[in-house]
């Protein structure tokens, strides 16, 4: 299928046919501050999600790259100042050197915060994975992306979705020739529930570990078109090495 039909997930839903936006369809409003590692990437507006992995580092999708980013932590309703937020500018934004904008392979970047986040009950880091994602494992996906599979409705409050990791065979069958070893699928082959525009870069967490980053898909919540996610396990060494080199 022509790559121009891919709806990838960067949140500025300008009318580009190759649009990197991503959303939660068929989910529910997260309990307030129940996803303390979730961040909003802001450049005057929310455009992507991300995950806090240490006091001073955030991981997101490579396609979410912008030269200037403010990281917003402790958010629930992104349109209201609720008193728990921390707004910290990015000091460094480091995209994976082998990121491919055409195939979205190596769709990962790191953000160093200009000052460490204050860790508390509303803002805390998520652990990196110690094993690759296993088929059938329940996962939590979260974000402020579009909640409609057709049309647009961007929520103010953080949305959550519980969904299973699919087998690599199911993933590859859904997108023949498009799935690399650095990608995996999460969701429901029958459709109806998925991430979508605006969720890009956000977390997929299983058993308390960050297994995935919202990356791409064909449409949102479509039958036999599950969401595709960056396999964080493959990048643990790169993450650790990059942090060490930029401390």
From Swiss-Prot:
The encoding gene: PRSS2
Cofactor(s) demanded: Ca(2+)
Reaction(s) catalysed by this chain's protein: Preferential cleavage: Arg-|-Xaa, Lys-|-Xaa
Any GO molecular function: calcium ion binding
EC number in record: 3.4.21.4
Keywords (A to Z) from UniProt: Calcium, Digestion, Disulfide bond, Hydrolase, Metal-binding, Protease, Secreted, Serine protease, Signal, Sulfation, Zymogen
Impact reported for residue 153 to H: Abolishes tyrosine sulfation
Active site (UniProt): 63, 107, 200
Species, as recorded: Homo sapiens (Human)
Protein name: Trypsin-2
């Amino acid at each position: 299928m022509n790559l121009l039909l891919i709806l990838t997930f960067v949140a500025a839903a300008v009318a580009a046919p190759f649009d990197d936006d991503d959303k939660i369809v068929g989910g529910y409003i997260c309990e307030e501050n129940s996803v303390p590692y979730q961040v909003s990437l802001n450049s005057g507006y929310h455009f992507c999600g991300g995950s806090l992995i240490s006091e001073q580092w955030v991981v997101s999708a490579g396609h979410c790259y912008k030269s200037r980013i403010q990281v917003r932590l402790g958010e629930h309703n992104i349109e209201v100042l609720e008193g728990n937020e921390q707004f910290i500018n990015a000091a460094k934004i480091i995209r994976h050197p082998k990121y491919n904008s055409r195939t979205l392979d190596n769709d990962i970047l790191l953000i160093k915060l200009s000052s460490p986040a204050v860790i508390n009950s509303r803002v805390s880091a998520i652990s990196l994975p110690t094993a690759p994602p296993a088929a059938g494992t329940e996962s939590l996906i979260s974000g402020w992306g579009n909640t409609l599979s057709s049309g647009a409705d961007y929520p103010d409050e953080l949305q959550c979705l519980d969904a299973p990791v699919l087998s690599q065979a199911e993933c590859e069958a859904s997108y023949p020739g498009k799935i690399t070893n650095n990608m995996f699928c999460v969701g429901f082959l029958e459709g109806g529930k998925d991430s979508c525009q605006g969720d890009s870069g956000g977390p997929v967490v299983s058993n308390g570990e960050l297994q995935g980053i919202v990356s791409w898909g064909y449409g949102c919540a479509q039958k036999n078109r599950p969401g595709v996610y960056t396999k964080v396990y493959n990048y643990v060494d790169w993450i650790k090495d990059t942090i060490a080199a930029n401390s």
